[in-house]
Amino acid sequence: MPVDGKVTFATSFMKEDGAYVDESMITGEPLPSEKQKGAMVMAGTMLSQGRLRFRARQVGEDTALAQIVKMVREAQGSKAPVQRTVDRAALIFVPVVACVAVLTFVAWVMFGGFDCVPQGIISAVAVLVVACPCAMGLATPTALMVGIGKAAEKGILIKDATALEQLRRIDTMVVDKTGTITIPNSNVDFTKTSSMPLEERETIKPNAAKAMTMLTDEGIEVHMMSGDTPEAAAYWAKKAGIAHYMSKALPQDKENLVRTLQEQGHKVAMVGDGINDTQALALADVSIAMAKGTDVAMDVAQITLMTDDLKALPEAVAMSRRTVKMIYQNLFWAFIYNIVCIPLAAGVLHLFGSDFQITPMWASALMAFSSISVVLNSLRLKYAI
């Protein structure tokens, strides 16, 4: 039974009232949450005040925290489409470099005679050593590991690298209203209409309007889908700052909107939290689920937001763009390195009367430096996002 400041070790159900739990590591919410009898306490959260008497439901690898760690590790180990392209290029690069090394030796012997055989061997070895597929191979995974890890710190769980790469292409985002833009209000009001039952009102999420503005500023068009009446949908859309909305939307309507937008040439992200969103989530180019939504929605989604702060949406887009930009930056410098260093190692400057040439010793140092520089450049991403 943890005391104040202790981390809970199991996902459990409370057996009595009177505890406040810091769930910021899971939900991103800074304030402790009051736990009553029957409430769930997530493993990895911290007891802020009171005492816990609970019945354990999940321990070890079954807890949400363990699943999050597993998901992040799998995502960091997954390959983005650009990485597959680089891998194919590397398969060609290695035999090409071997051929260049052989041609370097042959050229030295042909133009310099047998006296240049030692120089030919040195030059061929220098070419083999200085050529660095490692830098190209490290360019993508190092940036992805940093980007996905940084996203997890911000409460954005990315299931695979493809989603991170595709998110930067998004120009349209479809969002479900209830549970995404709004949350149920704990205050209950009576409506003064004889035929109307008791209604529970909603409230817009903090920073929802700001998040929509940030998305618009990034060039992303936002559409809101709601099952409400046209009047209610218009009210919430206006409050969130969303220009495009649909009322009385059924699950197939959400799917049809995503398909229509895609047919118009748009790259579409779908954000939802319920079973009724799963069809649209599965169809979208990038699918995003809210952590407090249904398990089905989270299973379908490629990205899960662990926080209710919708600013995580524009942050995720910005993170995707910066990560992919870093990948291409790494690849650019890796190719420039090889384009410059391989001819120098082969002794091409001798054709212009210069004796400068990269020796095998310097080639090994340059090869190591190129790999280290790619890693260090990727680590800059941690402080840029």
Region spans (language model):
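Juxtamembrane helix-loop transition segments at the membrane interface in multi-pass membrane proteins
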Residues: T142-A161, L379-I385
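Actuator/coupling domain of P-type ATPases
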Residues: T11-G18, E23-A124, P197, I204, ...
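Residue-level signature of catalytic and energy-coupling elements of molecular machines
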Residues: G5, G28, V41, A56, ...
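Helix-interface capping motifs at the ends of transmembrane segments in multi-pass membrane proteins
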Residues: I92-V130, G155, E200, W333-A365
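Cytosolic catalytic headpiece
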Residues: M71, K159-N276, A280-V286, A318-R321
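Transmembrane alpha-helix detector for multi-pass membrane proteins
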Residues: A126-G149, A368-S371, L376-S378
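Conserved cytosolic headpiece of P-type ATPases
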Residues: P2-P30, L52, V59-Q67, M71, ...
